[in-house]
Amino acid sequence: MAAIKKVVLAYSGGLDTSVILKWLGDNYHCEVVTFTADIGQGEEVEPAREKALKLGIKSENIFIEDLREEFIKDFVFPMFRANTIYEGEYLLGTSIARPLIAKRLVEIAKSVGADAIAHGATGKGNDQVRFELGAYALNPDIKVIAPWREWDLNSREKLLAYAESAGIAIEKKQNKSPYSMDANLLHISYEGQILEDPNVEPEEDMWRWSVSPLNAPDKPESISIEFQNGDGVAINGEKLSPANFWVNLNELGGKHGIGRLDLVENRYVGMKSRGCYETPGGTIYLKAHRAIESLCLDREEAHLKDSIMPKYAELIYNGYWFSPEREALQALIDKTQQKVSGVVRLKLYKGNVIVIGRESKNSLFNAAYSTFEEDSVYNQKDAAGFIKLNALRFIIAGKANRDK
């Protein structure tokens, strides 16, 4: 590999990426540019600027961007058009955030003339794959530095020792969670510590976004969600930007103990991993989106969507957001959403999301045909021929078996 002259680092301002920042200079002797993305993680991102400056980064080489609206509009909403769930439970909160970060890393690298990007994902997880597949899809010539796959700082003690020797300030935060956490507007995840035993129940004080369903309000709350062309646009009649829509939905879900999840998932790199997640807004949204689709989609259209969803979810989980196959599936999915518009009413109660009504100007529900009362449009005698034709293969097979 040719000598790297300039690298763009995905920088959080935390211990790990601060160590990486200094390590890149010590080992690659290159200029470092930092990129910090605000995707709704709930922490102030501006302190990352001060930390980078203290570590010797030039002010013009520090990029801090608010990507919350783009994250929801161009990544979360398109994903939910497919009602995407990985392995029957996971709403892909971490997976869907990585393509946007990879995209901006590559774009910034181009704008500043960098020949490489770097990230702080470990060599055991999925994120290394997601970042790097995204980067190579967008720029096949980009170089990627993954320090966790190169260095020997493979313990917390070694990281702290390196930080001290490099003059990196180590902050001791009060009430700091012992878990490894990752958050954005869609969810917050928890891994590590006692969660590494899949049979140990997480402690109640681990959960940060939601009350326990046991302690949620004793009175249900009714809300409405309006959709236009498959995407949410309003809550309780109030039009909201994509990011504000999600902030409000998270608050409603968290208040009622909605969206907690404890699962063991199959990582792309081959191992099983136990994680806990809070996705309050996403849990409500998925229920509502399926409800409005139930009115607006043709039966075969809906069933086709359901059949491709697991593959679509797998592509996102494994890091193939920018792949031609994901984009092809997205085109099909987006086509189905052109008439998915209307309003869904729901009740939120102690961890439950209950659909209580749905309406759409594009509804395919026709009471004249579906009524249980007498009607003048459906001839029930027609069903006999329909059944007979669909039973023909059973009749032929049955006779063949009987004659043996």
From Swiss-Prot:
Residues holding L-citrulline: Y90, S95, N126, R130, S180, S189, E265, Y277
Binding of L-aspartate, residues: T122, N126, D127
MF (Gene Ontology): argininosuccinate synthase activity; ATP binding
Main enzyme class: ligase
Amino-acid biosynthesis is among the record's keywords: yes
This protein's pathway: Amino-acid biosynthesis; L-arginine biosynthesis; L-arginine from L-ornithine and carbamoyl phosphate: step 2/3
Cross-referenced PANTHER family: ARGININOSUCCINATE SYNTHASE (PTHR11587:SF2)
Name of the featured protein: Argininosuccinate synthase
Organism: Helicobacter hepaticus (strain ATCC 51449 / 3B1)
